[in-house]
């Protein structure tokens, strides 16, 4: 059984076992984030969904108005004019068949992979490499597109993808714990609005079940969902 560090025990003692408002939770998150690096602020949201049913699956993207605080490295696979567009738009890595070959051999030094629709049949063979890492291009994620410039700018500017896992939980970053409180609150509110907007048609009963915040190395803080609805 994994031991809880003395540091985490101390931080947990600062969080009462109660439900907090969104603003209170963000204040505590910032106060309990004291690692020697810039910790990511994370939301962990349990929804009343069973993703084994097609009409209860949820996968979407949202642009955080205050960004993620992370430098996102974008790779693009395209041909001809679209490849040139990618290079001009600031893609960190770009290529065609040769980049597909490099990825198949283990090159994964990027955070997002964007591709044009015409090249997707060639990328299909990379499913085993990209799939488990959440890097496989997808229309739903906005990573299969002809608008290469827009997609690159959005991901570098704060666009994040979220989806429910097998247990109906969403794990999504919403900035760095060092962000001003009002910026974190704004990003969280944007995520909440997006989840409501993209509510699956098959959702039954209570949609929002639990909502926790934490920093990378910090304790969990539970939000009072009724204060958001």
Curated annotation (Swiss-Prot):
GO molecular function, one term: structural constituent of ribosome
GO BP term, pick one: translation
GO cellular component: chloroplast; large ribosomal subunit
Keyword RNA-binding: yes
Primary residence: plastid
Top-level lineage group: Eukaryota
Keywords, in A-Z order: Chloroplast, Plastid, Ribonucleoprotein, Ribosomal protein, RNA-binding, rRNA-binding
SUPFAM superfamilies: Ribosomal protein L1
InterPro entries on file: Ribosom_uL1_bac-type (IPR005878), Ribosomal_uL1 (IPR002143), Ribosomal_uL1-like (IPR023674), Ribosomal_uL1/biogenesis (IPR028364), Ribosomal_uL1_3-a/b-sand (IPR016095), Ribosomal_uL1_CS (IPR023673)
Keyword hit for Protease: no
Gene3D superfamilies with a match to the protein in the record: 3.30.190.20, 3.40.50.790
Cellular compartment(s): Plastid, Chloroplast
Family from the record: Belongs to the universal ribosomal protein uL1 family.
Described function: Binds directly to 23S rRNA. Might be involved in E site tRNA release (Potential).
Subunit (UniProt): Part of the 50S ribosomal subunit.
NCBIfam families: rplA_bact
Listed PANTHER family: 54S RIBOSOMAL PROTEIN L1, MITOCHONDRIAL, LARGE RIBOSOMAL SUBUNIT PROTEIN UL1M
Entry protein name: Large ribosomal subunit protein uL1c
Organism expressing this protein natively: Porphyra purpurea (Red seaweed)
Gene field: rpl1
